Amino acid sequence: MISKVLVANRGEIALRVIRACRELGVRSVAVYSTADRDSLHHELADESVCIGPPPAASSYLNVPAIISAAELTGADAVHPGYGFLAENARFAEICERVGLTFVGPSSRTIAKMGDKAEARETAAAAGVPVTPGSDGPCESADEVKRVGAEVGYPLVIKASAGGGGKGMRVVEAEAEVEDAYLNASREAGVTFGDGSVYVEKYLRRLRHVEMQVLADSHGTTVTFPERDCSVQRRYQKLIEESPAPDLPEDVREGLMDASERLVGSLSYEGAGTVEFVYADGEFHFIEMNTRLQVEHPVTEMISGVDIVAEQLKIASGGRLEIPPEALSPDGHAIEFRINAEDPGRNFLPQAGLVEVYNPPGGPGVRVDSHLYAGYRVPPHYDSLLAKLIVHSRDREGAVRRGLRALDEFAISGMETTLPLHLAVLEDEEFLRGGVTTSFLAQRNLESEGGLLRLNVIGS
């Protein structure tokens, strides 16, 4: 078993990893920027090292500082969490070269799946359905036009090196290709340092469904029940749930089989998530995230498996010993991302002093957060403040529990997305289940009696 893990992250995920280490008897090292000197992960870890000033480029993305911290403290492994360096193949390679165990797949696998065009080719070669589109990157607007002539419009141009909506443009007709190609390529180059793009057929009414996998070095792969992540804003997930509501059993089985085929073709090790779109009764591969997901607690709640602990065991060379019953969903779980954003003012980012922090409790309620009363939320990083996860015997019960827990959750000192989640849980379409990724885009947020309400545009 690895003996000391440096956690190359901050916030709630750093706390999550440190707690898993404690339960396994593994010592932990926190790294922190000067903006996070009062952070809980800095306090809870066995050791901590300041790695730089507030900007992420000078701290949490500062590879030499992180490697030096590992050497200084005698850490023998690095857990990257999510975001920052979690899917940076170069960082994983450096860890490998200096003898640090990277808690995740190999640098080669990260690089292969990090190039979205190559990942698409890899999936197709493994027999996984992919959306009709280009074979690899498109080198010119003319290539995009050729794909359009073959598969039809609309198309979506995507950055090969990234995600999150950056370097992405929807093209409705051939006349739009030139500008869309140039703009997508330019944005991809600025954001990811790589301007290459590829093209897929654009599907309008789709759901975002993903499969959580674990794989060890002994050839064992475990695939958990699917998560539905369709409630999004500008390609950023806000609510995730498992199992996916109103999903045919044959589709569920197909998603599991496709995920296992892809993971098997990669000789994968660690935790990963295979992401798909589901539309018109068919599913297609989007990408594979070679890291722990923000929404991993949803799977933990319905399976009883500690995914972070399993990551650490796999990295230590251990075998997966997950009972078969953990792979069938035990009830229903929903996760709500509580962000420091004002939904009433176009999700304006928030920062400042947390005056009151009172998380909910009770049966089937979990809160993963780094907040406390008196904590000052810095403006330099991701807006995630907390994750509220609720679990019940069925979806209806999980929704009721979510309404109660959200109403009980008190954070003051800044605006948050708590009111938005309450509004979603009162929306009739969401309650029916199976909403598409355009769910929020089709609605206006309006204040009514001091509460937010979602109203369908044009209704």
Task: Give residue ranges: language-model regions.
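ATP-binding N-terminal substructure of ATP-dependent carboxylate-amine bond-forming enzymes
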Residues: 1-125, 138-146, 397
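A generic structural signal for short coil/turn motifs at secondary-structure boundaries
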Residues: 57-58, 110, 167, 296-298
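Acidic/histidine-enriched active-site and ligand-binding environments that engage anionic O-linkages
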Residues: 146-156
